[in-house]
A protein has these predicted regions:
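Extracytoplasmic thiol/disulfide redox context detector
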Residues: 1-78, 137, 144-162, 185-191
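Cysteine-centric redox/oxidoreductase cores and disulfide-bonded domains
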Residues: 2-5, 76-163, 167-191
């Protein structure tokens, strides 16, 4: 595989299969038959992850048949005290098939996540159209705490050190990328 110009891993031995990067229950969108599997490791409190979410939304609109996006949590607890709780809340939203709505609302309300009040997660659940009783039963009891940790450990094993980190068909690219950079990588992979 050709090396990308935007700081990717350069040797083919460092390619990681999608099977190792993602699990069947990870939030995903895009066709299963897509030529490109894009695995994202992200943190809901990371400003670069927030910036990237809007760019990736545009990318998926431009390449709806070519990219399957898979989301993995990588809460950077050392600097984002509510990132892990946000990831758990996202998993509870995914349980109701509303992950992407909740994902978008979390990023829209990112500054409120710095608050010491976990009620923001319940407000966002309501705003995203989740069943509040189901969400409370899930989030209030930490149902997905271990799953979030599994995502994090999968990221560590794959060499993720910060967010966002992307894997394009197994090739790692770190950091917030411009739409133009994303498109260059996608075009290279579609050749």
């Amino acid at each position: 595989m050709k090396s990308f110009s935007s700081n990717p891993t350069s040797s083919s031995s460092s390619l990681i299969t999608a099977a190792k990067l993602a699990t069947a229950d990870d939030p995903a969108k895009g066709p299963a038959t897509a030529k490109i599997t894009l695995v994202e490791f992200s943190d809901f409190q990371c400003p670069y992850s927030e910036e990237s979410a809007a760019v990736v939304k545009q990318l998926l609109q431009r390449y709806p048949d070519d990219i399957k996006l898979i989301y993995r949590d990588f809460p950077v607890d050392s600097i984002h005290s509510f990132a892990r709780k946000a990831a758990e809340a996202g998993a509870c939203a995914h349980e109701q098939d509303k992950f992407w709505e909740y994902h978008d609302k979390l990023f829209e309300n990112q500054e409120a996540l710095n608050n010491e009040d976990s009620q923001i997660f319940y407000k966002i659940a309501k705003d995203a159209g989740l069943d509040e009783k189901l969400f409370t039963a899930c989030f209030g009891f930490g149902k997905y705490k271990s799953e979030v940790e599994e995502d994090y450990q999968a990221g560590v094993s794959a060499g993720v050190r910060g967010t966002p980190t992307w894997f394009f068909n197994g090739q790692k690219v770190q950091g917030a990328l411009s739409l133009e950079t994303f498109e260059k990588i996608v075009q290279e992979l579609l050749k």
